[in-house]
Amino acid sequence: MDHAVATADEPRASPQRHLRWAEGVEAPAAGMRLFYPSGFSVSLDVPEAIAQFGHTADQITAILAAGEKKASKSPMAISKEHSAALYAYTEDSPLYRQLNYAMRTPSTPSNPTDNQLKLFADYIFHAERALNCMPTHVSSIAGPVFRGVNTLLNPAIYAPGKRITWQAFTSSTRKQAVTLTFLDKLPGRKLQGSVFIIQSSTAKDISFFSEYPHEEEVVFAPNSGFQVEKVLRTEGEKQSVLSDLAAYDMSDLDVYLLHQVA
């Protein structure tokens, strides 16, 4: 698989986009979570579902226009509404921040995220249906996908052999260099954070419908499960699998090899 060579001028992600790519990695041992209340049936269309996140009428109109434009040029069959649902997820807006927080955070009396999930259930439904229209990224054919986060994680949770679940929608990319946007860069061209190199079996390529198509985003559906195959320790090991990042010092970068199991 070809990758663009990384440079020191890689764009920086906004704090919000850092969150979209990083959320849900700190507590992956909680298992699967139900996102639809008992007896759920869809009651909101896509524009109404997006409005639950606080979008204005003008913002929703713009999202629908972008979705319609992308759907009209799409190489795969998809409705303009489902196209808009995907586009809304990739925007720099409160939607994904509120959504992923509610999906990954246990509900407590002081923080009743289950109440938020009831508000967001229609959007989750539409987004999952939209993902089903997307091409599947099968790593045995198309190569691994990559996820970079500017966080160092508990090594006990991500130890080799561990099974983990990422409950929320999870973003990754086909391009190694895109992970630089979501890592911390320290003096001396040193990278800090964590990179996951993932063998995918069901993730969906949404890059055509993204606000940032250059990121070549591939999304894992909620409750995707993985096994930690290996943690790379040496600079040589890291450079061998992250050749596009070889110009950087990766001594403070944790690199995990994951295999999707669910």
Describe each model-derived feature in a short phrase.
Residues 1-68:
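Intrinsically disordered, low-complexity, charge-biased terminal/linker regions in eukaryotic proteins
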Residues 1-5, 146, 175, 228:
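Short low-polarity hydrophobic stretches
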Residues 3, 21, 34-36, 46, ...:
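Generic detector of low-complexity/intrinsically disordered segments
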Residues 41-209:
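Internal glycine-rich, Lys/Arg-flanked active-site/core loops of soluble domains
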Residues 150, 162-163, 173-180, 186-262:
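Active-site and NAD+-binding cores of ADP-ribose-processing enzymes
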